[in-house]
Amino acid sequence: MWVIYIISKKQLLTHPGQYRLPTSIKCIGYVFCAIFYFKGLFIKPKDSFGKRLTDCFYDLGPIYIKFGQTLSTRPDLIGIEVAENLKYLQDKLPPFDTKIVHEKIESKFGKKISDLFTKFDEKPVAAASIAQVHKAQLKNGDIVAVKILRPDISEKYERDMQFLEFGAKIVSTLIKKAKRLKPKEVIAVFRQSMKFELDLRSEAAAASRLYDNFINDDSLLIPKIYWELTSSDIITLEWVEGVSIYDKDKIIKLGLDPKEAAAKIAVIFFNQAYRD
């Protein structure tokens, strides 16, 4: 019901922007509006469809934020205007309680935080849709990043994926032109990628393999994995300072050439493809 309420509030089915929806879909949209957002029957949205879709994903939470980010990479499927809006979909959410962080770590590894770390920052350095990251120091002095999945994220993932799969079936059935976009296949691929993200052992294994492949290559630094402090919902890895690839000003301030950096990234990408 919450999903339908948000879709109705954003008027996605009644005012779909540049998209031409079948009359049957629009009628369903108006019925939803009448039930969940009555005033939407009498007012037109001020924002573009792309902006409203972005807001909708954000309001619906972690899995939808990830799905929106995935869609943003496919302007060929959803159109340039919508893709550009979805690029601004921030993967940032309020952090969950540090008490829960302590409980998860201590129950998983059978030791108190104080026995595992010399320092453990209570405030996360990043809180995203799937997990949050805390900076810490091990007993041997190593500075590490500890990434912990959000509580109940796996249950929310399964619930939200079932709704997305249901939505894909509806779209495939009612919108004939949408079949060529293969919505059910898109959701299936998304399910697989999310399955990978929700098991941090997979992320750790991929990082370890990459570390081995680039061990004699100084063009790329892969953080070391601390396997003794890694599980399906917690990963501990070497702390590495860095700058976002999107922060062009900081990159230039560091004395780097953005074009040269982009070229190196391209080479690294192809090296991964050939080495793996």
Each predicted region: which residue ranges?
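Broad phosphate/nucleotide-binding scaffolds in NTP-utilizing and phosphate-metabolizing enzymes
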Residues: 1-272
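Catalytic-loop of the protein kinase fold
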Residues: 275-276
